[in-house]
């Protein structure tokens, strides 16, 4: 009994500490975003050219008043928006039943999919996990995909969002990521999808978290992402554990093939849907198609709702974001987007990062949507979204050789960031 009480006290202390850290970090992050928006200068480098073409795309209304975008080079794929990290009363500190969370998500205007990923410590057991599966299935519809999973919540080794498993793994007694990784190697978990959750958020765990992205080649196909955005409007873009690179770059340079993931990490159904979105480019809205796209790293992470499709052109061959491409002398990255008018977000700047280092920055005109209403673009009344195309032309010697990777950071004016999944130069695996 004493041990149980001690564990509860540790958990409560951890939650209180994290809440305090969140509030202070949120203030400093907002200040930093505003400072960056006004002080960052353009950076131009030979052999990298950034062009921005606004007001290009039309939208059409589908389903529950969603705006779906038809991008001309999307190869028949669709962009679906959602969240993969949230909690209900099935977690120790969650508010709102699973039914309330799924119902709120399904009624939101732009969530195509939504996952409840309950903390496995203390309260989650096999009965509740089976019940969560059942509840999830009850909320599925033509326009909404409910997903269930769990958050492996190790006080020392870190938190991982785990999807597409029939069972969950308790972190009790686990001292390092090796315990989770051994479980993931079992045949029963062959379809598991795993995400590094909120790196660096719990500062007391920083010396040990993820054992700083220790690589394991046997599960590289299962650990598919890392949260680059956490809560609203916090962004965990760096510095990482070493203080020089961003968390995503530290993980990728450790050998992992990763997609950026946004996380609302809601612990209260009243906060659903929030602003953060994961964009998944898939053939259709089904669990099979969404999980297949996640496995291919065909995602983007954003701190505000947006429709986006990015791809790389190597010669005549097109590769969606997240792909592994062959080495070449020239490379073109095309990124098309539409931001809903009601978000009132203008783009502030575009950055090109190669192997974790910023190589080029383009400052954009600071705009509001009031400046972008000259051409009606939607069949929906009173809807004038900002839209545009970003084209990046990269030539040798700035195209990395294998292994290497390139990605964009796109900044909304005082609204956070979005990151399309990197383009990887194959064969990518570093280890």
For the regions a language model picked out, list residue spans one by one:
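N-terminal Sec-pathway targeting helices
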Residues: 1-12
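Hydrophobic alpha-helical membrane-insertion segments, chiefly the h-region
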Residues: 11-22
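Extended, charged catalytic domains and RNA/DNA-binding interfaces, predominantly
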Residues: 20-431
């Amino acid at each position: 009994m004493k041990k149980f009480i001690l564990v509860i006290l540790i958990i409560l202390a951890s939650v209180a500490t994290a809440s305090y850290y969140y509030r202070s970090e949120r203030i400093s992050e907002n200040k930093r975003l505003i400072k960056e928006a006004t002080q960052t200068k353009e950076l131009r480098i030979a052999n990298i050219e950034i062009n921005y073409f606004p007001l290009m795309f039309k939208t059409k209304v589908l389903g529950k008043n969603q705006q779906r975008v038809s991008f001309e080079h999307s190869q028949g794929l669709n962009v679906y928006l959602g969240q993969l990290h949230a909690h209900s009363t099935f977690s120790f500190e969650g508010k709102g039943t699973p039914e309330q969370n799924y119902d709120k998500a399904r009624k939101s205007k732009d969530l195509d999919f939504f996952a409840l990923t309950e903390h496995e410590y203390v309260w989650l057991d096999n009965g509740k996990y089976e019940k969560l599966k059942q509840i999830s299935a009850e909320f599925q519809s033509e326009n909404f995909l409910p997903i269930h999973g769990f958050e492996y919540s190790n006080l020392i080794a870190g938190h991982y969002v785990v999807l597409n498993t029939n069972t969950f793994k308790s972190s009790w007694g686990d001292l390092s990521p090796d315990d989770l990784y051994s479980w993931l190697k079992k045949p029963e978990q062959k379809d598991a999808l795993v995400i590094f959750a909120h790196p660096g958020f719990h500062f007391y765990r920083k010396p040990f978290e993820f054992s700083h992205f220790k690589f394991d080649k046997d599960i590289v196909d299962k650990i598919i992402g890392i949260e680059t955005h956490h809560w609203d409007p916090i962004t965990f873009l760096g510095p990482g554990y070493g203080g020089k690179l961003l968390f995503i770059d530290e993980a990728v340079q450790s050998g992992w093939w990763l997609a950026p993931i946004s996380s609302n990490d809601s612990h209260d159904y009243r906060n659903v849907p929030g602003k953060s979105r994961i964009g998944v480019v898939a053939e259709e809205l089904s669990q099979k198609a969404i999980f297949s796209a996640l496995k291919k790293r065909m995602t983007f992470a954003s701190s505000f709702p947006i429709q986006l499709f990015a791809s790389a052109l190597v010669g005549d061959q097109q590769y969606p974001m997240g792909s592994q491409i062959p080495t070449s002398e020239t490379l073109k990255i095309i990124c098309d987007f539409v931001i809903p008018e009601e978000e009132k977000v203008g783009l502030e700047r575009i950055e090109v990062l190669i192997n974790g280092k910023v190589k080029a920055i383009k400052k954009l005109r600071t705009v509001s949507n009031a400046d972008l209403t000259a051409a009606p673009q939607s069949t929906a009344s009173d809807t004038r979204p900002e839209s545009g195309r970003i084209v990046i032309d990269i030539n040798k010697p700035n195209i990395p050789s294998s292994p290497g990777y390139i990605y964009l950071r796109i900044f909304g004016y005082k609204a956070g960031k979005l990151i399309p999944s990197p383009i990887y130069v194959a064969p990518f695996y570093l280890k």
